[in-house]
Amino acid sequence: MIRKYREADIDQILDIWLSASIKAHAFVEAEFWASKVNEMRDVYIPASETFVFESDNQVAGFYSLYGNTLAAIFVSPKLQGEGVGSAMLDDAKSRRECLQLTVYQENTPSINFYKKQGFISLGEQVDERTGHPELVMEYYC
């Protein structure tokens, strides 16, 4: 079930974010992601509209919207490939007429996932925090 984020979810969300970030972005030092946990908790999650996918009273994944930007979508690594991400992305699409996102170019599985979900590439940019190239993608904007 997908529901709105509650403050009690924060520890599970941060655990998922950190473990999934390290797994998906092995080309960035794990220490970088660990250094961003407090910023996620104190800045990014509160500033966004966040929803969680709950299964058996546990958070299995979450996504965050900031305006029409899909600012985050993360699934617990042990549940990836089981439809959680697709369900969350479908939910996000139902809440916005269009969505934009950025994804690291080295993150081929996520790029393929977004393309399968109907996103198209608009161009490229460099993430100032990591120096890695990203694709800018959109869905029906």
Predicted regions and their residues:
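A short beta-loop-alpha structural element at the N-terminal edge
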Residues: 1-15
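Conserved GNAT-fold acetyl-CoA-binding loop/helix
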Residues: 14-40
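A short helix-loop-beta-strand connector motif used in the catalytic cores of GNAT acetyltransferases and
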Residues: 41-52, 69
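Conserved beta-hairpin
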Residues: 49-61
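A short, internal acetyl-CoA/4′-phosphopantetheine-binding micro-motif in the GNAT/acyltransferase core
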Residues: 69-80, 103-104
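Conserved acetyl-CoA-binding loop-helix of GNAT-fold acetyltransferases
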Residues: 81-94, 112-116
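Conserved GNAT acetyl-CoA-binding A-motif
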Residues: 94-106
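Conserved catalytic-core motifs of GNAT/GCN5-like acyltransferases
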Residues: 102-104, 120-136
